[in-house]
Amino acid sequence: MLLEDACQALGGTYEGKPLGSYGDLGCFSFDFVKTITCGEGGAVLTNNDKYAINADQYQDHGHDHIGNDRGEEAHLYMGYNFRISELNAAVGLAQLEKLDAILQLQKRNYEIIRSVLETVEGVTFRRVPEGGVENYSFLNFFLPNGELTQKVHKALSENGVDACFYWYTNNWHYIDGWEHLRNLKTLGNVSSKFRNQIQKLNETDFSKSDAVISRTISTLIKIGWTVEEVKVRAEKMKAVIISAL
């Protein structure tokens, strides 16, 4: 089974095919910093009937959803309470109708900022494969080394440029900050198989990842910005980066 994590990739494509449709299952997130949101949660996409049925049952206590009487439904196995509410689902459907407009705004704002930062010596960007169209919810750029990147990140914050993230020292999205996972700090029991797999994290060489993440700053692309606001932000980022370098 190929489980495709496309949580931050909604709207991205490769050779005309949407990201999230390459795996047996594609996963999307709808939390508040994703391309569209319905409060929390996400969605799983699949063309496999068995996977679809299993996912539908598993997220609702294992109910088989046969018939109209919930009290008469069978439970083929244990599941969890991961159901989305009708209110959240309604918000999600409304967001889907706005998706094309949201993507256009993000692309516009992304390209304005990138076009300005491209003129700064020492700033580079990730490579998108030929035939690929990326998701524009974040602009990721690289600086020559980790020390300079931390300096620039601090300077951006001190100069009022919000929503710029340095994941390398952030406890949110990088393995160095995941002591709870590496040391299996949990309120419950875990299987020996899971414990053995997690233990490998403490023995894994992440030096290549460190070399990339330590030089990366990610800036959120908001859809509420006007063109003028984006231009002002871009020029401010440019000035701060040049000053820090």
PLM ranges: what are they?
Residues 49-50, 146-151:
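Secondary-structure transition into beta-strands, especially the periplasmic turns and strand N-termini
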Residues 221-245:
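C-terminal/domain-terminus segments
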Residues 127-129, 136-146, 166-184, 214-229:
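Conserved PLP-binding active-site segment of the aspartate aminotransferase-like
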